[in-house]
A protein has these predicted regions:
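Bacterial N-terminal signal peptides that target proteins for export
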Residues: 4-22
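Bacterial N-terminal signal peptides
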Residues: 22-33
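N-terminal cleavable signal peptides for secretion/export
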Residues: 36-100, 104-115
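A short, structured loop/turn motif at beta-sheet edges
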Residues: 58-63, 92-101, 128-134, 241-243, ...
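Short beta-strand segments that buttress and anchor functional surface loops
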Residues: 68-74, 105-110, 138-143, 250-257
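Hydrophobic/aromatic beta-strand elements that line small-molecule binding cavities or substrate pockets
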Residues: 87-94, 122-129, 156, 268-271
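Hydrophobic/aromatic-rich structural module bridging two neighboring secondary-structure elements via a short loop
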Residues: 105-157
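Mature, soluble, non-transmembrane domains
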Residues: 139-307
Length: 307
């Protein structure tokens, strides 16, 4: 039995990805978060393109920080959905455009199905992303009920005037090539912030984050709501840096690259501060939705540029 609260030491690997609960095989039709985001989008949708945002992206600083979020079951629909869920996310982010970005993530989730025993999923990931978006190294491991389930290990490299090449080590050695328009995760967040600051409402980009089996990219659609500048209600977010900082309600839908239908694999919603910190997480898997409340936040120093 997993014990809560989960204590995660600094540097313990972990992150958002398509396989957060893949071990539980729970994916389905996801539409409620997308519709909610669309309802909050100003009339006259403005859609951003990566090319139009490049100049803004290069100037966006991201705050090094460590955040912990408690997960609870917000909504469950249908016979396949769990009757109970709880968990915790620990997120470590540090670095700069000069030296690159290190991201460590752990998500521990306990699900109680309608029938059968409780299932526990424990996912870790550690990534490094070059500050200019030229390379991305990733390592992920998932345990289900204390048994190894999935391992992914590899490196992606943006080739000069060419595609993004991926060298996979696990789950099996493989070399892949994707289009030149693919973004890496931190780069993706910076483009969302650039679009928000430019007053855009929608951003559509292709993303590679090494998730699932490390061999696929996702088409993503991001809806950006009106900016909020009032303090957040949870105590963890009530720090001087965030008190009057703008944040935007953001909803990101992740689709398979093939996109044979219009139903995303899953949808992630959160409030995104202009320094990259997130609060009020909503992870929508179709049959059920998990809410993530920020329980602690620690700002970390960003080392001076070594180049």
């Amino acid at each position: 039995m997993v014990k809560f609260p989960l204590e995660v030491a600094a540097g313990t690997p972990v992150r958002r990805q398509a396989g957060l609960l893949a071990a539980a095989s729970i994916f389905g039709l996801i539409s409620s978060s997308v519709l909610a985001a669309a309802a909050n989008t100003p009339i006259g949708v403005l859609q951003a393109t990566p090319a139009s945002l490049q100049g803004v992206v290069d100037t966006i600083p991201l705050a090094s920080h460590r955040a912990v979020y408690d997960l609870t079951l917000l909504k469950a629909v249908g016979t396949k959905s769990p009757t109970g869920a709880r968990g915790r996310i620990a997120f470590d982010f540090s670095g700069s455009a000069c030296d690159g970005y290190v991201q460590n993530f752990r998500q521990l989730t306990e699900l109680q199905p309608a029938e059968g025993p409780t299932r526990i999923s424990d996912m870790h990931s550690a990534t490094f992303e070059d500050g200019s978006g030229k390379s991305f190294s990733f390592k992920m491991e998932t345990m289900v009920d204390d048994e190894p389930s999935d391992q992914v290990d590899g490196r992606a490299q943006r080739l000069t005037r060419g595609p993004v090449g991926v060298d996979l080590v696990k789950p099996k050695p493989e070399q892949l090539a994707f289009g030149h328009d693919v973004l890496f995760p931190t780069e993706h967040i910076k483009y969302i912030l650039a679009a928000a600051k430019a007053g855009e409402n929608t951003l559509e980009v292709r993303v590679f984050d090494g998730s699932d089996t490390g061999d696929k990219i996702f088409d993503t659609t991001t809806f950006i709501g009106r900016p909020i500048d009032t303090p957040a209600p949870e105590a963890a977010a009530q720090i001087p840096m965030l008190e009057h900082m703008r944040r935007w309600p953001v909803t990101i839908s992740y689709f398979d690259d093939a996109r044979n239908d219009e139903a995303p694999n899953y949808t992630l919603s959160f409030d995104l501060y202009e320094n990259g910190i997130s609060r009020a997480l909503r992870l929508n898997y179709g049959d059920f939705v998990l809410a993530g409340e920020m329980k602690s936040l620690k700002l970390l120093p960003t080392p001076p540029c070594t180049k």
